Amino acid sequence: MDHVIGGKFKLGRKIGSGSFGELYIGINVQTGEEVALKLEPVKTKHPQLHYESKVYMLLQGGTGVPHIKWFGVEGNYNCMAIDLLGPSLEDLFNYCTRSFSLKTVLMLADQLINRVEYMHSRGFLHRDIKPDNFLMGLGRKANQVYIIDYGLAKKYRDLQTHKHIPYRENKNLTGTARYASVNTHLGIEQSRRDDLESLGYVLMYFIRGSLPWQGLKAGTKKQKYEKISEKKMLTPVEVLCKSYPSEFTSYFHYCRSLRFEDKPDYSYLKRLFRDLFIREGYQFDYVFDWTILKYPQSGSISKPRPNPKPALDPPGPSAERNEKPIVGQDLRERFSGAVEAFARRNVPSHGIRPKHIFSDDASKEVQVSEKTRNEIATKMAVMSSSQPGSSGELSENRSSKLFSSSAQKIQPVQETKLSARLGRDDGLRSFDMLTIGSGKRK
């Protein structure tokens, strides 16, 4: 007998699982649309799906923020329905043999900073910035980065009074140790500066191939965190960024200069990398490394310059990684739909285009034919992790502190109404995400 979630989503095959529950393909029985269904046992030790769904609702409308379709309780499970997205940046990093060019890193940096800035503008910290929690879209949104996984997100200020949360110490580590800021390791309450410092480590991870504190051995998780913390604090920024453009060093110095309640100058950080991008002579054409790898002819169109800076570490899997195999299909096949859209848009058809376009509305830069869209036959939800074992704050009743409503259901938003309310063709109506923990990264 077919299982139907919320009276409208037919439960399909299982495509992933993790510490917070299980991930399934679902079909909207009314429209035939594929969705991703995240199921969490009601009796789980640390329930977070209800909280996460409410954060999704509060962030709706932002570029690169997934659109939640439905949340409710079905039998013994909390359930959330959202659209499928393309691969995560961690998946694409592996696809590109664990090394990104400077051009790809800079194109990503512009969008990643924008995503973090938007969350902060809505009063939330992400607190688990890592490659797994950024996904590419599909089809016309294939060059747009989405920020996902709000299970550890925290409200850092009151939206009415703008009062900032108080400075505190002796906090347990929340997030992923590999990308955690130095202050987070020191037990200091996180604020906006910490999300941005974590993002800096993500960028260096991409361009270097690995970080100096990967692969450390320890007897216990606590000892491993301590080793990572020690190595991170003993690695000067100048050493971490050695042989790479000075803008990366400047990025870290700025983030670490911020005080606890300071509002970061996001424009300054984006300008650092945009100026470097222009100085290197790159074209902001959304031809990423994975585009060229899948469709080599796209590289001859954009003629990206090679990364002039040598990598400090040879690319290769970290010794500390313990990843599950990709479910159901080969890695390259999994990305074919997303990469296809990148390649299609690189055929010049409207004359000469400007070289430098820094725009969050990435969809305006992509033209995908109906044939191409039909070729995207299989869309995989990408799994990411936000492990409860790494957080010392899961005992906090975040949901009750943050939201007064105790309602168990979020009514599905009519897509036409959403578009009218936002006053634009949002695109989030068609390209969304689902995340569930599947592999620990420390």
From Swiss-Prot:
GO MF annotation, one: ATP binding
The entry's ATP-binding residues are: I15, G16, S17, G18, S19, F20, G21, E22, L23, K38
Q: What are the residue boundaries of the Protein kinase domain, all occurrences included? A: 9-278
UniProt-recorded name of the protein: Casein kinase 1-like protein 10
Subunit arrangement? Monomer.
- Its main localization is cytoplasm
Q: How is the protein altered post-translationally, as described in the entry? A: Autophosphorylated.
Catalyzed reaction equations: L-seryl-[protein] + ATP = O-phospho-L-seryl-[protein] + ADP + H(+); L-threonyl-[protein] + ATP = O-phospho-L-threonyl-[protein] + ADP + H(+)
Q: Point to the regions of Low complexity compositional bias.
A: 384-394
| Disordered as annotated region, ranges | 299-323, 381-421
Which family does this protein fall into?
Answer: Belongs to the protein kinase superfamily. CK1 Ser/Thr protein kinase family. Casein kinase I subfamily.
What's the source species for this entry?
A: Arabidopsis thaliana (Mouse-ear cress)
Any one GO cellular component localisation term in the record: cytoplasm
Polar residues: bias regions:
400-417
Its EC number(s):
2.7.11.1
> Compositional bias of type Pro residues: which residue ranges?
305-317
Alphabetically ordered keywords of this record: ATP-binding, Cell junction, Cytoplasm, Kinase, Nucleotide-binding, Serine/threonine-protein kinase, Transferase
| Subcellular localization(s) per the UniProt record | Cytoplasm; Cell junction, Plasmodesma
